[in-house]
């Protein structure tokens, strides 16, 4: 009502803009008028869906991302890329499993808060890590907190406990901390960065059937700097991957096997070999056949960050069925197939002597080795 009155008191375009800026933080919607499922005057009840997302074809997205980092004085590019990969994982999971009710995004000052936005991201990240990499992430949602304290009779005690949990949950470094976070003020500063980056990709599809070079460009800018020289990690250029792939009698192997070839890269890094092989399959197989072949592609990666990068990369290439296992390829298969902490079965399962093709360029340049 107060906001309605402020609009009524605005006598010209300058005052209207001031009210919009101060009350709504310049919020606007990119849908809500011409779509078939929209009811008049119900713009806040719009449910974002996958079908309303646009194809990501803008190379300028990287420059916009870099601009956000400069704007907020974020110099740690590797950390920023790690957090961006986490955001991509959230979005890919959302597009895959929540097509009719997307959770990814900031829904404006009138319908959302920074804490709720991050809470949704943390939930999506937990589900994505479980689904794509078989990793268990500890997370307590706002709904869980409300449910567990629902029966608490003393309202003051309930609020105190909820505030303690909120501080532990949000006011510390986390999987979406582009900036150092250890109090409410820093949480809000980081939330501004997170909001801008989320909004950068919220209206675009990251899962599609065509090749997307955007993530590859980010690899070049963030992954190869420092890691290659300091840790002996090399990312095989796409051109070398393609050269090796073209050297294989792939068409002959496919014609001789009635079942899909089982393929493995036991040190898959950013997933270049896996994605190049999957792209090459498109020359010989139909769209219906491809999915089954993708399910038989396996990558093992010992480095935690790169296992996530590899999964994001395969999804953005439209090859989400590729299996990525966060494990040590030099360990026994029995150990590699379990999560170290709880002994739960990891995904995917690796069986000895079960592969038809090995494509890899394992790390070899480590000082003092």
Task: Go through the PLM ranges and name each one.
Residues 234-345, 349-353, 357, 365:
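Conserved S-adenosyl-L-methionine
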Residues 89, 96-224:
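Long recognition/docking surfaces used for binding and targeting
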Residues 68-69, 216-240, 245-246, 250:
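Class I SAM-dependent transferase core
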Residues 83-95, 315-316:
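Short, hydrophobic/amphipathic alpha-helical patches that form generic packing surfaces
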Residues 360:
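A short beta-strand submotif of the Rossmann-like class I SAM-dependent methyltransferase core
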Residues 1-83, 175-176, 180-183, 191-209:
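Short, basic/polar, glycine-containing "phosphate-handling" surface segments that engage DNA
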